[in-house]
């Protein structure tokens, strides 16, 4: 039994809860009132799904608490407790007393994350970074004295991903040399014989039939959002593909006019509109990877594959980011990451 950790009060905002969730191991919060009466639980996925329903990030957690949480009165990790974990596929089981007050929680002792693959796409040329990537691959560009690849690997390893693969092409030998110098365990490197697009390279590494899901990130994406949270969201959504996204206000560089036949009916000075942008982190179910492997083309880009899945009527869900993240795709973004990551 564990206590204190993972508890929040019901008057915190969703943003507060998300910030706390990124720091806790099992990605589940226990919600109580000021008298420590147990009210329910809340996961990262609960919050993300609420945001997709247009709930505001500044709203209180009180409005989206899972009041039907599975609980136990047993303070010892018994066979009954273990059975509940396996039956309901949960990672945290709150313990309450006869007065419905929260006293602690159990964590599931089996770590299922080892059944999932973590893949870093690091084959691109990184041409938008100019002279920086003429000598080194983008994956080895440094932010806060560490290569991008080292930041991503440290985060994945900390979150207990046990099977990590890196797909390379451009200056692959430098990435291999870096990995050897760090003596990483359970990290394998694969060099493409030719560029296979932003997702095609997965075909060559998807050989382990025991893997349930593949979490894929571009090597130039830095975020403090938990990879495990994205994976858990994908699993709980029963999605074929999960795409990390964020709503962004885009301002036009030009004025815009509305025309009705020959007449201008409205003028807008550099109008703004919302776009749901793709971040560069995905989770694919095993069966989705099998579909990818059946495509005969060697070079496959993610937009084409997503449209292919849409035609197949597969379940594709967004994982909405509200947190800041960094796409190290150009000099401006690199400098931003060096300052703010």
Q: What is the predicted function of each stretch?
A:
Residues 106-134:
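N-terminal nucleotide-binding beta1-loop-alpha1 segment
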Residues 125, 219-221:
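Active-site metal-binding loops of divalent metal-dependent hydrolases
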Residues 215, 222, 228-231, 235, ...:
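Catalytic-core segments of class I nucleotidyltransferases/pyrophosphorylases
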Residues 237-247:
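A short, conserved acidic/glycine-rich loop-to-beta-strand motif
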């Amino acid at each position: 039994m564990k206590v204190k950790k993972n508890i929040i009060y019901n008057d915190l905002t969703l943003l507060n809860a998300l910030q706390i969730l990124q720091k806790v191991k099992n990605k589940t919060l226990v919600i109580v009132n000021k008298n420590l009466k147990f009210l329910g639980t809340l996961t990262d996925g609960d919050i993300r799904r609420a945001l997709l329903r247009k709930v505001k990030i500044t709203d209180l957690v009180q409005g989206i608490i899972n009041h039907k949480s599975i609980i136990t009165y047993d303070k010892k990790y018994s066979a009954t407790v273990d059975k509940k974990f396996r039956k309901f596929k949960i990672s945290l089981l709150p313990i309450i007393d006869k007065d419905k007050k929260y006293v602690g929680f159990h964590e599931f002792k089996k770590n299922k994350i080892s059944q999932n693959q973590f893949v870093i796409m690091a084959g691109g040329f990184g041409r938008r970074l100019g002279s920086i990537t003429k000598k080194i691959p983008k994956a080895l560009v440094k932010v806060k004295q560490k290569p991008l690849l080292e930041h991503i690997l440290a985060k994945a390893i900390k979150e207990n991903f046990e099977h990590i693969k890196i797909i390379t092409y451009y200056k692959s030998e430098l990435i291999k040399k870096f990995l050897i110098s760090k003596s990483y365990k359970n990290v394998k490197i694969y060099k493409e014989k030719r560029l296979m697009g932003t997702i095609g390279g997965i075909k060559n590494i998807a050989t382990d039939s025991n893997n349930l899901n593949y979490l894929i990130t571009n090597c130039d994406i830095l975020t403090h959002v938990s990879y495990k949270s994205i994976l858990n969201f994908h699993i709980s959504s029963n999605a074929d593909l999960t795409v990390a996204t964020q709503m962004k206000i885009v301002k036009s560089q030009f004025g815009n006019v509305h025309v009705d036949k020959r007449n201008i009916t409205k003028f807008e000075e550099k109008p703004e509109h919302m776009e749901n942008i793709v971040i560069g982190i995905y989770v694919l179910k095993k069966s989705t990877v099998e579909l990818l492997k059946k495509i005969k083309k060697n070079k496959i880009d993610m937009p084409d594959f997503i449209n292919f899945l849409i035609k197949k009527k597969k379940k594709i869900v967004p994982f909405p980011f509200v947190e800041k993240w960094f796409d190290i795709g150009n000099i401006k973004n690199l400098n931003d990451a060096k300052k703010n990551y």
